[in-house]
Amino acid sequence: MEEQHSMPTKYDPSATEKKWYTYWLKGKFFEATGDPDKQPYSIVIPPPNVTGKLHLGHAWDATIQDILARTKRMQGYDTLWLPGMDHAGIATQAKVEGKLREQGISKYDLGREAFLEKSWEWKDEYAKFIREQWAKVGISVDYSRERFTLDQGLSDAVKEVFVSLYNKGLIYRGEYIINWDPQTKTALSDIEVIYKDVQGAFYHMSYPLSDGSGSIEIATTRPETMLGDTAVAVHPDDERYQHLIGKMVKLPIVGREIPIIADDYVDREFGSGAVKITPAHDPNDFEIGNRHNLPRVLVMNEDGTMNEKAGKYEGMDRFECRKQIVKDLQAQQVLFKIEDHLHSVGHSERSGAVVEPYLSTQWFVKMRPLAEEALKLQEYADTKVTFVPQRFEQTYIRWMENIRDWCISRQLWWGHQIPAWYHKETNEIYVGKEPPRDSENWRQDEDVLDTWFSSALWPFSTMGWPDEEAPDYKRYYPTNVLVTGYDIIAFWVSRMIFQGKAFTGQRPFKDVLIHGLIRDAEGRKMSKSLGNGVDPQEVIDKYGADSLRFFLATGSTPGNDLRFYWEKVESTWNFGNKIWNASRFALMNMDGFSYSDIDINQEKSIADKWILTRLQETVESVTRLIDAYEFGEAGRVLYSFIWDDVCDWYIEMAKLALYGENEQAKQATRSVLAHVLDQTMRMLHPFMPFITEEIWQHLPHEGESITVANWPVYDQSLVFEEAVEDMEALKSLIHAIRTTRSELNVPMSKQIELKIRPQDEQMAARLQRGVAYIEKFANPSLLDIAVDLATPEKAMSHALSGMELFLPLAGMLDLDKEVARLEKELDKLNKEVERIEKKLNNQGFLAKAPSHVVEEEKAKQQDYAAKRQTVIERIAELKA
C-alpha cells in the first residue's frame, strides 16, 4: 500500500485491527512458502480445546509464539506457525451432553452416531469462535494448514501409533486398579486427577479372630470398601502379630472369613501396624493381592453406587453407604474410635467428582521402555530438548524416571475409537488400522483413546506423518520451539517427546519455552469460584489488542507467573498513544518527502548521529533478547528507546533542524527521523502488530506490509561514539538545569544565567558543539562556558561528570521571598513529622490499627522526613 502522510489525531484500535488482519490474510503473508532458499522455522500451536472461550492464558501463550513467528518471518525464515484445535474428549462430551439435557435428551436417546453428529456441530461452532478470538489477538498463523485432532490425517496417525505399540507389546489390555470418575463414568490417567486436602476421618475398628481368641485393630478412611476386604496384612517382622499370621478373622457385617497375611509393604509404625486389604479398590492392595493370590471383590458400580456384592447396601451411593456402615459398625460395637483426619483426596480434573480407585479392564501403554528411550535424547547436545528456563528439565526428567503405565482407554463416544475388535464367538482380539475382513463377525471396542494420546502426536501428525515423504514433515519437522505452561509438562510435553522419539527417531522440538500462570493483582489463580477472571475480549475492547499483547509480553520472565493489573494495561495504551503522536509529528514535517528521499549518509547533527547510534544498540539488544526468549526485557528496551530517546529527546532536538532555515540540515533530520521510525516500528511489530502496521503504512516505506519487511540489522557504520559522548554530557547538563528550575519554581519561560566550568578543553569543545541544544532546552539569558571560569557568588551549583554547573540566583528569583516560602513549607513539614511520630509512639494505635495502616504511617514518616531535609538544605544554600 502507498504511504499517506496525514494521520488521524487519535489512534482507533477497533477500526484499525480488523482492517489490517483482513489485509494480512488476503495477502497470505502468514503462509509458509516452502522456499528452498530460505531456512525453515516452525512452531505448532498448543491446540486449544473446542469447548468455549479462550482465556488470558491462551492470549499470553499466543502472544509469545506470535512474537517469535513474526520476528523470524521478518528475518527471512520460511516460517510455519501451524494452528489447530483439540477435540478434548471428556470436556467436549460433557458440554454436548449438558446441552442435550437442557432439551430433555440423553446421549442414549440419540445413539452413538447421532450423538457424534451433534458433537461435530459443536466443534464447528466453537472452532469458528476460536478463530475469531485468534484474529482479535492478531496471531499470524498459517490457516491453510489448520489441523484438528480428529481430522482424517491425525486419525490415521493415531491408528498407526496404536497398532505399532500394540504389536511391540507396549500397549496391552488388562484388569488393573485405575482412577475412575463415577460422574462421567470413565477412566482417568494419573495426571487427570487433582488432589485436594479434605477434612475426613480415620475409622478405627476391630476385626474379631475366627477362633474367638481376640481381635486385630485396623483403621481406614473409606469404611465402605471393607465390604470388599479379602485379607488383613501385617509386616512379617512385627513381633506383635507373628503369632497371628495365617489365622482367619471374621469380617464385620459381612461375616466372610479372610486371612491374616504377612507382607513387607506394611508400615509397622503407622497406626496399629495392621491394614485391611481390598484388592479391587486400592492400587497398593491390588499389588499385595497379586502377590498373595487374593480374590478381588468389586463392591461398586460404575456410577459410584454399591453393587450386589455389597449385600444390603446395594443401590446406595458410596458416601451414603459410608454413613450407614459407620452406624452399623457402632451398633456391632466393633468401631471404637473416629479420629478427625485431613487427607489428600483425588478429584476428577474435568467433573470435580471424587475419584474412585476401581478395578477395571482397560488399555494401557507400557511406559518404562518408552521413557528410557526418550531420556536418552537428553544425553547429547544435538538431540536434547532444551528447556527454558533450564530448571524445568529436572521436572521433566523426574516425571519420566518415576513414570507409571498410562491408562489410555476412556468410556466415551467423542474421540478416537480404539482400533481393536473382539470376535463375537471366540473373543479373540484383533488390532489393526483397518477393520477385520469378516467384520460382521467382530465387534469394535466401544471405548475411545485418552485425548492426550492424539495430542502427544501433534508436532509430527500435523505435518503429514506417517507419510515420511510428506513435504511439510520433511521440511518443518522437528519444530523449533514449543511454548507452553509449566502445568502440562507431565500431561503433554513428556508424551510428545517419548512419542516423537519412538516414531520419528528424534526430538519433536528443539526448545520448550515454559511460561507460568496468569494470576490476579493479589497473586491468586484466576477462577470462576473467586470471580476474578478477566476476559481478554474485555481488555481488547477497552484498550486494543496491542496494549494487551505488550503487557503480556513484558509482564513476566520465562517460567514465572504473571499478575494482571488493569493499570499496567492502561500504561501500555499510553505507550501506544506516545508512539502515535510522535509519528504524527514526524509526518507533519514530511510533506513531499518519499522513501526515495531517505539518505542517512549525508552530513548529520549531533542529535541525528546519537539517535542512529542508539538505534543500532537497540537493534542488537532486542534481536539478542528475542533469540534468548527474553521478551519482557526486549520489550522494556524498546519502551525505553521509544519513550525516552526518541520521544523525549530526539524529536525535541530535531525541531531545531525541522523548524530552521538550513535545508540540508532539514533533509538530513527528515531522513534520520523517517529511518529511525521505520526501523523502530519493525522491531516493535512482533509485540504490537496493528499500530505498527498502521504507522508504517503512513510513513515513507517500500513493500506491501511491515509483516514481511526485513528485520533491522546492526550497522556499525551508523555508530558515532563521539556524538554519544556529546549527547550524554548535554543530557546530564540539561537535566540538572530542569531539575533546579523545578525545585525553585522557576518556569521554563523565564530566562536564567548559566555558567559552566568544563574540566578540560575537550569537554569545553563538546559543550560548544551543543550550544544550540543548551539554548533550546535551558532558555539562558547568558551562557558562559570556560575552563577557567571563576566560581560565582550566590549560585546554585551542580557537580556533573566532566563539568560544574552554576546558576546565579540573582535575577532568577527573589531570595528573601523564596527563603520565606521554604521556611513556611518547613513549618508544615515539621508539624506533619511531629503528628506522625506522636501517632507511632501511641501504644494504643499500634495495638489496634491493622498492620498495613501502621506500615503506611511509617512510610509517610520517612517521606516527610526526607522532604524536610531537602528543604533545610535548600534554605541553607539560599542563605549562604
Curated annotation (Swiss-Prot):
Disulfide bonds: none annotated. A motif ('KMSKS' region) lies at residues 525-529. Pfam families: Anticodon_1 (PF08264), tRNA-synt_1 (PF00133), Val_tRNA-synt_C (PF10458). The keyword Ligase applies. Catalyzes the attachment of valine to tRNA(Val). As ValRS can inadvertently accommodate and process structurally similar amino acids such as threonine, to avoid such errors, it has a 'posttransfer' editing activity that hydrolyzes mischarged Thr-tRNA(Val) in a tRNA-dependent manner. Its EC number is 6.1.1.9. The gene is valS. A motif ('HIGH' region) lies at residues 48-58. It catalyses: tRNA(Val) + L-valine + ATP = L-valyl-tRNA(Val) + AMP + diphosphate. It comes from the Bacteria. PANTHER family: VALINE--TRNA LIGASE, CHLOROPLASTIC_MITOCHONDRIAL 2, VALYL-TRNA SYNTHETASES. GO terms for biological process: valyl-tRNA aminoacylation. It is found in: Cytoplasm. HAMAP family: Val_tRNA_synth_type1. One of its GO terms (cellular component) is cytosol. CDD domains: Anticodon_Ia_Val, ValRS_core. One of its GO terms (molecular function) is ATP binding. Belongs to the class-I aminoacyl-tRNA synthetase family. ValS type 1 subfamily. InterPro entries: aa-tRNA-synth_I_CS, aa-tRNA-synth_Ia, Anticodon_Ia_Val, M/V/L/I-tRNA-synth_anticd-bd, Rossmann-like_a/b/a_fold, tRNA-bd_arm, tRNAsynth_Ia_anticodon-bd, Val-tRNA_synth_C_sf. Residues 809-846 form a coiled coil. Keywords: Aminoacyl-tRNA synthetase, ATP-binding, Coiled coil, Cytoplasm, Ligase, Nucleotide-binding, Protein biosynthesis. ValRS has two distinct active sites: one for aminoacylation and one for editing. The misactivated threonine is translocated from the active site to the editing site. The C-terminal coiled-coil domain is crucial for aminoacylation activity. This is Valine--tRNA ligase. Monomer. ATP binds at K528.
